[in-house]
Amino acid sequence: MSEMTPREIVHELDRHIIGQQDAKRAVSIALRNRWRRMQLEPELRQEVTPKNILMIGPTGVGKTEIARRLAKLANAPFIKVEATKFTEVGYVGKEVETIIRDLADIAVKMTKENEMKKVKFRAEEAAEERILDVLLPPPEDAWGNKEDVEDRGTRQAFRKKLRQGDLDDKEIEIDVALPQVGVEIMAPPGMEEMTNQLQGMFQNLSGSQKKKKKLKIKEALKLLIEEEAARLVNQEDLKEKAIESVEQHGIVFVDEIDKICKREGNNSGDVSREGVQRDLLPLVEGSTVSTKHGMVKTDHILFIASGAFQMSKPSDLIPELQGRLPIRVELSALKVGDFKRILTEPNASLTQQYIALMKTEGVDIRFDDSGIQRIAEAAWQVNERTENIGARRLHTVLERLMEDISFDASEKSGESFVIDADYVNNHLETLVDNEDLSRFIL
């Protein structure tokens, strides 16, 4: 779980996302509150529920990007889902409870990786011993029994060579555990326990089979370390820790929530829209979901919802769900200045990406300040005249601008190009000024 302060979280988000300080502050406080809650006494901790967030703003202003970056910073089970992928219980499609099941799977994977890191040193030692046993097999007596004769000097010499990598390319034959045969059983929701028992039965029938494999020592060592680490990790403890991690630190980001609102003037009983909201409500309020790893309580899972709300308003959400999203954050539409900053300031900005890509062909690209200003203006103009798709318009404009250089780059190795205002005007002016063309091409 992340122990970063709100200021540190905002600073980290600033490296990738331009502007939108209100949204950054809201998610950073919510993330820090997860840590604060864990410092409380157990009795009080149970009473402190997360303050869920609703992010409102036009498309392409950074809502989804904030979620993506937050996932990396959270160091906790995190899942991003699209609200439009789900349908009401009883209809064909995914049910909202699969969100928690997928989150539990993510937590198990994260916990397994952490637990395997803890036993890595012991696993490495055990893997080394197995390889040394293959390289220096103990002598056998007349009856084929292995004699316990220790030659410490030779073993230590081989161990040293193994650790230095001198034996990496030598081929050996080892016994490797075969992956257990996974039998996928499609069962109705709520019958996960039965499914697990059947899967466990099939896995036990297949048993832990081994197969001889001829591998280079470097590859064999990697395989054996994983095998030994998996053997040292207690699977039951792992599941318990994973479920606790989901319940106490889990974060769910629900994108496109405005698409499941009941639109104004539409009085038809739209099943898939309002029904999904009603199914989502118990998860946000707090309920218990059955997963293949065990029962998961959702009382303390943080939910962050986002939507453009162009065809609907937040008030079109059902009242109970509105009440469960108390923190509202509005993200502002992007201006020319924002576009200019997006092109230059973030880590691995779009201009840096194009410079690096062309460098692989030996072509040197430089973006002049006047060129960047003109690209930003062109993107903003097209957004204003046609559909406003926010920062995503920059991808379209830049791809069109760089098309000629990208196509001829392999024949122009060693050449240099400066992208200034004149270059941008020559390549984009007719497209930007002609509304019909920009509608179809930009």
Swiss-Prot record:
One of its GO terms (biological process) is protein unfolding. ATP binds at residues 18, 60-65, 255, 320, 392. Disulfide bonds: none annotated. The lineage of its organism: Bacteria, Pseudomonadati, Pseudomonadota, Gammaproteobacteria, Alteromonadales. It is found in: Cytoplasm. One of its GO terms (molecular function) is ATP hydrolysis activity. GO terms for cellular component: HslUV protease complex. Keywords: ATP-binding, Chaperone, Cytoplasm, Nucleotide-binding. A double ring-shaped homohexamer of HslV is capped on each side by a ring-shaped HslU homohexamer. The assembly of the HslU/HslV complex is dependent on binding of ATP. ATPase subunit of a proteasome-like degradation complex; this subunit has chaperone activity. The binding of ATP and its subsequent hydrolysis by HslU are essential for unfolding of protein substrates subsequently hydrolyzed by HslV. HslU recognizes the N-terminal part of its protein substrates and unfolds these before they are guided to HslV for hydrolysis. It comes from the Bacteria. This is ATP-dependent protease ATPase subunit HslU. Gene3D superfamilies: 1.10.8.60, DNA helicase RuvA subunit, C-terminal domain, P-loop containing nucleotide triphosphate hydrolases. Belongs to the ClpX chaperone family. HslU subfamily. Pfam families: AAA, AAA_2.
